[in-house]
Amino acid sequence: MPYERKIINDPVFGFINIPKGLLYDIVRHPLLQRLTRIKQVGLSSVVYPGAQHTRFQHSLGAFHLMSEAITQLASKGNFIFDSEAEAVQAAILLHDIGHGPFSHVLEDTIVKGVSHEEISLMLMERMNKEMNGQLSLAIQIFKDEYPKRFLHQLVSGQLDMDRLDYLRRDSFYTGVTEGNIGSARIIKMLDVADDRLVIESKGIYSIENLLTARRLMYWQVYLHKTSVAYEKMLISKIGRAHV
């Protein structure tokens, strides 16, 4: 049987392959498609007009990087079952499914005391019932309950695919070039030791650049005074509406 897939053209990474089957079903699911209407960087477009990209685009980009990371780790002798690869790809596709309007801006405003990660998990469990348990392994990885801890670290950790994508993507769409990290090199430097994600010594300089890029993106984009002021006004309006 020929390999069937859906090809999506992404402005940041080029062509992204989505295999037909579980992963394609996730991409088409209404709960993930909902992210096409949620901006990745909240109200940052008031400062950077190009920042119109969405959580859906970010999820696809993180999925693409996850696919590359799995291939790279396997090439270094780290055995990963096909079922584990599919599960960790599913987990990264769904990691932001719990985001509400304006992404992080209204977190803990509309629903008090509940993080978007908790909502993501709730929605994943709901989807798992719809899909007859096909997401069970992905949920284990997402909750860090799977023995191969490095799989969870690829989804949520200091060198996760979420972070590698959002820095490059947010840099691309805002035009703040300081965030344009060398994600391809970082992925090539990844390895596993004692079921933990590690970096080769020759990749340390790339990690230093990543940390610097992240700090600069927070300074210039995520915590820009104008964006923060708009966010505070929105939160205030929502708060008054709840009274």
Where are these regions (language model features)?
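Sequence-structural signature of the catalytic-core scaffold of metal-dependent phosphohydrolases
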Residues: 1-39, 46-90, 98-240
